[in-house]
Amino acid sequence: MGRSAGFILWLTGLSGAGKSTLSRALRAHLASSMPVEVLDGDEVRTWLSRGLGFTREDREENVRRIGHVARLLAKHGVGVIAAAISPYASSRAEVRRLAEEAGIPFVEIYVQAPLDVLIARDVKGLYKKALAGELAHFTGVSDPYEAPDAPDVTVHSDVDTVEAGLWRVLETLRKRGLLDAAAAA
């Protein structure tokens, strides 16, 4: 059986990098050993952060809200997987600080892929619009993305399979004592 205390897995990376895909794989694997919730950035924007725009302040507020909900869930033994672009290092550091002050383990996972791969994956054409100047405030094109300096885990989704990324995260959780060997297998 998995650990009864909760934790926060914070997946950050540009749009199309594979955060949602990896979060679904993590949920499927972890759900057999503990309660798990995914806080997906797109869903949070629809329900919890409706009305926020894409200014720096609004993006920081969105990350704060996700972090607050993640802490509440983790405090009650839920394994939380937050998958959000969360473009600013200071916002991610604040979420980590608040989690760790509350005694909640926090694992930052950087899901990364080169821009040309992200453009090729972009079925909505958002990168194309942003590069053409038709879409303002698009992270990684017209707005900055501050890549983590020292993430706990890095997944290169252009070369790593979903399974390889999943294994890398599970191995990190096991090494940190957040999963027992059975849940990590």
Swiss-Prot record:
Catalytic activity: adenosine 5'-phosphosulfate + ATP = 3'-phosphoadenylyl sulfate + ADP + H(+)
GO cellular component, one term: cytoplasm
Gene name per UniProt: cysC
UniProt-recorded Gene Ontology molecular function terms: adenylylsulfate kinase activity; ATP binding; sulfate adenylyltransferase (ATP) activity
Keyword match Cell membrane: no
Task performed by this protein: Catalyzes the synthesis of activated sulfate.
Binding positions for ATP per the UniProt entry: 13-20
Enzyme active site: 86 (phosphoserine intermediate)
Protein name, as recorded: Adenylyl-sulfate kinase
EC number annotated for this UniProt entry: 2.7.1.25
A Pfam family recorded for this sequence: APS_kinase
